[in-house]
Every structure is written in structure tokens, then in C-alpha cells.
């Protein structure tokens, strides 16, 4: 389980980048440097709007070489659970937010000879800190960034003017420059690691094409904070410590059922399968893992699960709660 510490920061700048994306610059309330981080790190942002509490994970896009501030970018989601809407509509310069210390589930692989970044939409954010981290490195890298059109391409001007702009490739479906994924992956050099962040369709396309080309699974790395589907078949949940039983319906998560029934005390910061704070041991049954936290080996072991997003594979699941 990840060990997060929460602390307050102040919003020093809010910049609209596109119609749907804003960049927020965060500084320490005492003016001191913020905790160090590495490229690909994220923070959990906790927000309060009256009786409503929101908790979202956001990648740090600023340079790991400069901890005078953190920067995050937030896309206003159409079906927002409240967090992105709150940040877009209510947070202003001077406001304070509670965030976690950085954690990294999407770090660069030190042994890689080359890093190939594939981004879709707001999935560009972790790669900005990766690129900054590699600024003084001899390791080669290349970025392919997909968006609908130039107007929806956040950070477009900065990427076009990047000191190593020849490594940056922008793909817009509206202008006929769509990414040719099959060709890109077919031509990768030995020792290349591929990192993908973006919508589920992009991630699945990379997985499928990489499998077709027999690209080693341990050279593929994915990150996707917004879990698009937490629903599934209903099942019986048993809390072993209390002996309580509940039915988890199709449209609810295990965590929601536990909270609604005040059945156990469970800490969860992100509610998106990212932070690991709701990790719970499995005593009986198997989990349908939908998190971004565990490795493939940890998921296969079926020893524990993140109850904010994952479900039961069968009809009955017994947890150590």
C-alpha cells in the first residue's frame, strides 16, 4: 500500500489551454520547495465543496528539476463526478488545495535504450515531466501525441517550440495526420520501451498491435487514471471480520456498498484505482482487477484488490474486513 502524506498548497496561477483544459500552478504555502518527484509522478488532489468531497489523481507535468512549484492540467469531463468541474469552475488564484506527496506508477525504465511516448488527449501530461527529466540525458526519446484537431491539442505551442522539437510528432485526426500505429510499432528499435497514456481505445490499440507484433510485454507501460467502467454482474460480498454480507449491485463498487452501509472503515484517496490506499486482502474468491496500481504478477496472485474499482469474477467474494 502506498504511503501518502497530505499537505496544503496554494494556487498561484490558472491558465486556460483549450476550451476544456486548464493548467494549475501550485506552490507551497510557506514558500519553500515542494517535495521532490520524478517524471511520470502524480498527486492526489482532495477538494471540498460544501457537503461534497472529491478526490482525483493528476499527473505532474512540470519539471522534476524545479520543485519551486507543481503543475497539473485538468480536462473538464462531460460526465464529471465533480472534481474536474470544481477545479474548472470554482478554484482561483490564491485558493488552497490539499494534495498528496507525489507517487510514481509510470516511471521511466532506466535500462531502456530509447523511450517511445504515445499520448492521447489529456494523456500528454505525464510525458511533459518525462521529457523535462530527460533534458540532460543522452537517452533517446520520441513523442507521438494524438488529438482531434489543433485547437484541442493542449500544450501544442510549447511542444512545437520544444528545444528538441524534432522528436515531437503531433497527430490530428481532423487534418489527416492520424497516427499510423502499426507502422510506428513495427519500426521500433531493440531496447525501446513504449509508454502509453490516454483513453481506453488508444491503450487497447497499442496492446493489440504490440501483441500482434510479438513485442515483449515487459517493454510496454500504460497509465489511465479515468476508469471508464466500474460496473459488472452483481455478486455477494462477505466481510470476514464482522461476518456481514451484502449484495454488490451491477452499478455500484464494493467501496460504495461498504460506505453506504457503514460496514467497515476503509481509507481511499483517489477512487480511481491509482493510489493503493484501499488495498484489501482477498480471503475467498477472485477479483476482476480494474486498477492501475498492481503489476500483472500481483493481479495474477489474487492476494489483494483495490475495492474502489475492482469487482468479483464470480458470485461470491470474501474480504479481510
Curated annotation (Swiss-Prot):
Every 2Fe-2S ferredoxin-type domain range: 233-321
Enzyme Commission number(s): 1.14.13.239
Biological-process GO terms, alphabetical: carnitine metabolic process
Residue span, FAD-binding FR-type domain: 4-109
Keyword list, A-Z: 2Fe-2S, Flavoprotein, FMN, Iron, Iron-sulfur, Metal-binding, NAD, NADP, Oxidoreductase
GO molecular function: 2 iron, 2 sulfur cluster binding; metal ion binding; oxidoreductase activity; oxidoreductase activity, acting on paired donors, with incorporation or reduction of molecular oxygen, NAD(P)H as one donor, and incorporation of one atom of oxygen
Pathway: Amine and polyamine metabolism; carnitine metabolism
InterPro entries given in the database record: 2Fe-2S_ferredoxin-like_sf (IPR036010), 2Fe-2S_ferredoxin-type (IPR001041), 2Fe2S_fd_BS (IPR006058), Beta-grasp_dom_sf (IPR012675), Carnitine_monoox_B (IPR039003), Cbr1-like_FAD-bd_dom (IPR008333), DmmA-like_N (IPR054582), FAD-bd_FR_type (IPR017927)
Organism superkingdom: Bacteria
PROSITE patterns reported in the protein's UniProt record: 2FE2S_FER_1, 2FE2S_FER_2, FAD_FR
Residues that hold [2Fe-2S] cluster according to the record: 270, 275, 278, 308
Reactions the enzyme catalyzes: (R)-carnitine + NADH + O2 + H(+) = (3R)-3-hydroxy-4-oxobutanoate + trimethylamine + NAD(+) + H2O; (R)-carnitine + NADPH + O2 + H(+) = (3R)-3-hydroxy-4-oxobutanoate + trimethylamine + NADP(+) + H2O
UniProt function note: Converts carnitine to trimethylamine and malic semialdehyde. Can also use gamma-butyrobetaine, choline and betaine as substrates.
Quaternary structure note: Composed of an oxygenase subunit (yeaW) and a reductase subunit (yeaX).
Protein family: Belongs to the PDR/VanB family. CntB subfamily.
Protein name: Carnitine monooxygenase reductase subunit
